[in-house]
Amino acid sequence: MKCPFCGSMDTRVLDSRPTLDGTAIRRRRECSSCGKRFTTYERYEEAPVLVVKKDGRREKFDREKIKNGMIKACEKRPVTYEQIEEAVNRICLKLREEGSFEVETKRIGELVMEELKKLDQVAYVRFASVYRDFREVDQFLEIVKELKREKEGEEQ
């Protein structure tokens, strides 16, 4: 495996373990040339899934888009990269279990929001504001009230 820091091909695996949901192998590696450590994930290749956009266009499913959106929502929040990676794995697993070769962006957005709600409420509101295209302050207030109602319901 090529080192992302110095480009050397001389790296070794320090630790290998399956992810919590079992869909990937997480490997901790060390470069023999520069000594830096990095993490890689090994996944099986799946049949291509197409994402149906709002305007009807179709494009190949890209888990990196989901991960990047979640990273953006979790920016400056106490959420680790590993937590985001596991959430993305759960989203991909749910989509795979649903068994469709086409999935609407709406479904992906709902799954991302479910995961973010569990991880961090501020990240959830950030993502919701973009995903639901908030244009008014009242829309933010409504989603915050919804979170508060859910939290109060859990405490009872």
From Swiss-Prot:
RNA-binding keyword on record: no
Residue ranges occupied by any ATP-cone domain in the UniProt entry: 49-139
The protein's required cofactors: Zn(2+)
UniProt entry tagged with the keyword Protein transport: no
GO molecular function, one term: zinc ion binding
Keyword list, A-Z: ATP-binding, DNA-binding, Metal-binding, Nucleotide-binding, Repressor, Transcription, Transcription regulation, Zinc, Zinc-finger
Stored PROSITE patterns: ATP_CONE
Cofactor note: Binds 1 zinc ion.
Annotated GO biological process: negative regulation of DNA-templated transcription
Pfam families: ATP-cone, Zn_ribbon_NrdR
Zn finger region (unnamed): 3-34
Recorded family membership: Belongs to the NrdR family.
Task performed by this protein: Negatively regulates transcription of bacterial ribonucleotide reductase nrd genes and operons by binding to NrdR-boxes.
Protein's name in the database: Transcriptional repressor NrdR
Organism of provenance: Thermotoga petrophila (strain ATCC BAA-488 / DSM 13995 / JCM 10881 / RKU-1)
